[in-house]
Amino acid sequence: MCNTNMSVPTDGAVTTSQIPASEQETLVRPKPLLLKLLKSVGAQKDTYTMKEVLFYLGQYIMTKRLYDEKQQHIVYCSNDLLGDLFGVPSFSVKEHRKIYTMIYRNLVVVNQQESSDSGTSVSENRCHLEGGSDQKDLVQELQEEKPSSSHLVSRPSTSSRRRAISETEENSDELSGERQRKRHKSDSISLSFDESLALCVIREICCERSSSSESTGTPSNPDLDAGVSEHSGDWLDQDSVSDQFSVEFEVESLDSEDYSLSEEGQELSDEDDEVYQVTVYQAGESDTDSFEEDPEISLADYWKCTSCNEMNPPLPSHCNRCWALRENWLPEDKGKDKGEISEKAKLENSTQAEEGFDVPDCKKTIVNDSRESCVEENDDKITQASQSQESEDYSQPSTSSSIIYSSQEDVKEFEREETQDKEESVESSLPLNAIEPCVICQGRPKNGCIVHGKTGHLMACFTCAKKLKKRNKPCPVCRQPIQMIVLTYFP
């Protein structure tokens, strides 16, 4: 595993997931530049295990704060000793193959003789598989811990094989669950690097803000003399499917998706809280705000209040500021004025007709019988005025007409007929276009208000409404008993 000559096979598939746990404990000696970097964060030895190197490297990145604040898996080392060591301005802890190569360029295996023999281990192991040599038990054990289709880059040395055989003999009586957990321990160095380095950089930053790092199982300040392998073993035992990720595969496996998802989840949990941009629109208290968005209403349609000079939308009748009624909001009622003008015109026409013709010099002819002519003219004026007054007063009966009837009953009948004629004349004199016709007769206008209680309904003429009252009929609209009928006049 610690062979610096990492030659990739011709088929392109490279993996280290089959390396036993004892290979991870192989002692390595950092080169002077890497050793200087490790000692700057508290390292005191000359030889280290791979896990110790990764731990100190993560401590260095965290101490120098070389990581990106937002994307904490990215490390910037352009102006740092780490950049001189790796020869790159920046890298990501997710680039396992690249980091794996850069680290091992600066490491020297303690036992060079044993590591030099690992270059021919591929052919030797194939011979052992075909010939059935004395190490058949070891091969079977290795076949259980690795995929049959994967190709090896380097094999462990002879001493590591012996240690693996002794470990398998000691653990032969353990349960299958312990054997499965042992296979998790024998995962790739690159996986340990990713978790040791990435979690040192990312997780310990979160430790300063919360105590959520307890669930990760990675110690923040481990005892390097006695507790490195123990803590790393506990961390490997706690992880499950996410440990199956192997960086040496050209094509990512299905397990790698689980690992990447869990890693991204860890990063998201360590970042600051997500901030969402929300736009809040304050609604107005009135309905006039909708006119501003109406494209059919322009500023020319707005009206100006005479009290406070406020510009208001065209539809509301009151000012939005002072609540003053809009000037000329409704047309003036000119019905009365028209009636007065027509009456005055009639009177003038009648007086002009009664006075006769004028001479060109606008003077009347003087006659000897001027008094008699004046009396006759006055009599004519009186008679014509009385006739016009009778027509304007809806043809009221003259007082002299009652003398014609001898009996009192005849007088009552005449008065009843006169009142009916008066009502009919009033109904006929009203303009039909001003009000709707009676619902019952469809001929006369609606001027008979049917009153019941404090309310009334105007839906029939006065004659039809009186007939309903005489026949004790209810109101046709609300079916309430009719109390009275009121004759309604319209201007």
Swiss-Prot record:
Consequence when changing H457S: Loss of ubiquitin ligase E3 activity
One GO MF term attached to the UniProt entry: ribonucleoprotein complex binding
Region entry Disordered, spans: 141-187, 211-237, 253-274, 371-427
This protein's record includes keyword Signal: no
SWIB/MDM2 domain span: 26-109
Gene Ontology CC, one term: protein-containing complex
Renumbered residue ranges of the record's region Interaction with MTBP: 170-306
Effect of S425A: In MDM2-6A mutant; abolished phosphorylation by ATM and ubiquitination by the SCF(FBXO31) complex
Modified residues (Phosphothreonine): T419
Stretches for region Region II: 242-331
Main subcellular location of this protein, as a coarse class: nucleus
Region annotation Necessary for interaction with USP2: where it falls in the sequence: 1-110, 276-491
Low complexity bias spans: 394-408
Span(s) of short sequence motif Nuclear export signal: 190-202
Protein name: E3 ubiquitin-protein ligase Mdm2
Species of the source: Homo sapiens
This protein's encoding gene: MDM2
